[in-house]
């Protein structure tokens, strides 16, 4: 069995080196402009998270789960949160370190695989911010269970995830269904996995809504709100016809 999470770590390092849009940190000017009524962060590509989902950040212990890249954590730090970022990409974490040193705020930076037990005590955080990233893990139930464990009672989980539509198709033109869902390359012919990694896509999975939303509920969370979203311009063609992403707010 391949160590697919290490492949994905290396893939994100390469994307970051090549200037992936999710690896470009906020500028000093953008950081300076952040205020309680003036900030925007993304769980999914286009729609910024409603401010009321955060419930106030000053003094709150916040975990950015698979949230490296220097885009969200600087905002949370500027708003007074006590921040920890956890990611499996060295390059994404290097960017977090660079921005924190440039702006002079403290942050705990931890490299790790979210398919393993998170290196935190039970009930360590008030809020977890988890943007689209569980497409890179096979077992999302484990991720939701770990989120529940490390959140304090009454804590908030803000999560973004793919709804699976992106995995139905291999090419944009024409839009022809070629894959069964849920998409799991580890259970498919070896050639499909080799094609995915050779194309520089890493090893990606789709997950059902039973896994994504049902998994949060099964872990013990109470779902409070959600919204749908699409790719930005130039993204997958299917986004012109239907939303591909969901963001959820859940409470422990």
What is each model feature region?
Residues 219-221, 236-252:
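Core SAM-dependent methyltransferase catalytic element
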Residues 26-60:
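Conserved alpha-helix/loop element of class I SAM-dependent methyltransferases that forms part
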Residues 55, 60-117:
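Class I SAM-dependent methyltransferase SAM/SAH-binding core
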Residues 156-190:
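Conserved class I S-adenosyl-L-methionine
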Residues 126-141:
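A short SAM/SAH-binding and catalytic strip from SAM-dependent methyltransferases
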């Amino acid at each position: 069995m391949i160590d697919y999470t290490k492949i994905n770590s290396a893939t994100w390092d390469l994307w970051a080196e090549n200037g992936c849009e999710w690896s470009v940190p906020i500028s000093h000017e953008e950081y300076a402009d952040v205020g309680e009524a003036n900030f925007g962060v993304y769980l999914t590509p286009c729609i910024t998270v409603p401010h009321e989902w955060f419930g106030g950040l000053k003094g709150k212990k916040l975990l950015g789960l698979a949230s490296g890249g220097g885009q969200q954590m600087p905002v949370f730090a500027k708003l007074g949160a006590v921040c920890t970022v956890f990611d499996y990409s060295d390059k994404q974490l290097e960017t977090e370190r660079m921005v924190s040193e440039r702006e002079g705020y403290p942050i705990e930076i931890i490299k790790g695989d979210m398919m393993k037990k998170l290196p935190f005590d039970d009930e360590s955080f008030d809020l977890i911010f988890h943007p689209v990233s569980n497409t890179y893990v096979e077992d999302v139930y484990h991720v939701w269970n770990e989120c529940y464990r490390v959140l304090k009672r009454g804590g908030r989980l803000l999560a973004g995830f793919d709804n699976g539509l992106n995995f139905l198709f291999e090419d944009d033109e024409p839009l022809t269904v070629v894959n069964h869902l849920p998409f799991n390359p580890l259970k498919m012919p070896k050639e499909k996995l080799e094609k995915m990694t050779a194309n520089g896509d890493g090893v990606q999975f789709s997950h059902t809504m039973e896994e994504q939303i049902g998994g949060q509920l099964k872990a013990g969370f109470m779902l409070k709100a959600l919204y749908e979203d699409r790719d930005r311009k130039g993204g997958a063609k299917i986004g012109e016809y239907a939303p591909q992403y969901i963001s959820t707010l859940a409470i422990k």
